[in-house]
From Swiss-Prot:
Family: Belongs to the XseB family.
GO MF term list: exodeoxyribonuclease VII activity
UniProt KW DNA repair keyword: no
NCBIfam families xrefs: PRK00977.1-1, PRK00977.1-4, xseB
Pfam families: Exonuc_VII_S
SUPFAM superfamilies per record: XseB-like (SSF116842)
Domain of life of the organism encoding this protein: Bacteria
Protein name (database record): Exodeoxyribonuclease 7 small subunit
Species lineage: Bacteria, Pseudomonadati, Pseudomonadota, Gammaproteobacteria, Enterobacterales
Function statement: Bidirectionally degrades single-stranded DNA into large acid-insoluble oligonucleotides, which are then degraded further into small acid-soluble oligonucleotides.
Gene for this chain: xseB
């Protein structure tokens, strides 16, 4: 597992670690200080994941700008 301030190798790794943190926090078994540390790491991972998603979206926009027939449309998740 990466060190506390180290960025995960990939988006998928960050997401997996974030899911693990959520599970531990939801269990309610962590002491307060550990829970705060886990929460802090979770916030870091969420921000890193959001940044990676924004970078991917920018790459898609660049690729689509080369193809004038294709236009990007907002993504709407089915589960919302």
């Amino acid at each position: 597992m990466p060190k506390k301030n180290e960025a995960p190798a990939s988006f998928e790794t960050a997401l997996s670690e974030l899911e693990h943190i959520v599970t531990r926090l939801e269990s309610g078994d962590l002491p307060l200080e550990d829970a705060l540390n886990e929460f802090e790491r979770g916030v870091q991972l969420a921000r890193q994941g959001q940044a990676k998603l924004q970078q991917a979206e920018q790459r898609v926009q660049i690729l689509l700008s080369d193809n004038e027939e294709a236009s990007p449309e907002p993504f709407i998740a089915d589960n919302e």
